[in-house]
């Protein structure tokens, strides 16, 4: 059980600039992991196993990518009770991201807007951090936690050359991942969402599937690949994506990323900032895409539901919409690590 009441930490952190608070938190987690300090945020892992994409998830609540972009805090995050943790997005080369300020809180809506832009230390540093984590050094047979590695393209890479970046990242992370997520839906890298269109997605996933086949043959292990999509899609676009995922043998879909829509936060401070909106206002849009995906993909295709989970009831709504497991990020910032256990128990109690 966590020794530190999150309300106290949140009051302090929310008095700071949003990105400065984020960096301070990540530094604290990185320094405190694998030490007695970890008891400050440690929570029991709820047991609710599920088999999905050939993997055994210890429970159905995971961490969404974006919180730990450089894979510095895997062990600290594992201690919060997640069944799986996804880190990244990583790009082949280090990049600073977009100019600051680039992260904003909308507390009245329990939301965030960010335009970070895949700021990260690059593939080599990312992989080195993954390799150093206890989750990896103790071996896959010893660690129950599943680790997802999320990959993207550099901002300076022309969109027509994006496939090259994804294949470079796939090759780099492949030996260390329980699953890989292909991020084609961040609104903060110019033209990235164009990769969700019919022809572009077909080309990208075809190349990824072929390269995954080569890596699996060489390394003797087939790593599941998920694709992360946006909530800002109509039913026709969702149907095309669903067909393309199945055509190329993708193992699952992560639905959804942040939204560029602002309907739910109009008039609030920072609502006009450019970037992706996350948190409570995204819940229904994300759930709508999940329902459409489930209808298009059938009952067996794995869906990771993410977007707007700030309570146990929100997590349950994702499962009822058609997700198999869920991820949280903004909810962790507003509600703290206790949300992980509450959500996992609520989902377990559905059965």
Curated annotation (Swiss-Prot):
The protein's annotated pathway: Pyrimidine metabolism; UMP biosynthesis via de novo pathway; orotate from (S)-dihydroorotate (quinone route): step 1/1
Pfam families: DHO_dh
Record keywords: Cell membrane, Flavoprotein, FMN, Membrane, Oxidoreductase, Pyrimidine biosynthesis
GO cellular component, one term: plasma membrane
Tagged with keyword Membrane: yes
SUPFAM superfamilies from the UniProt entry: FMN-linked oxidoreductases
Positions bound to substrate: 69, 114-118, 183, 188, 257-258
Active site: 186
Subunit and partners: Monomer.
Function summary: Catalyzes the conversion of dihydroorotate to orotate with quinone as electron acceptor.
Family: Belongs to the dihydroorotate dehydrogenase family. Type 2 subfamily.
UniProt-recorded name of the protein: Dihydroorotate dehydrogenase (quinone)
Designated gene of the protein: pyrD
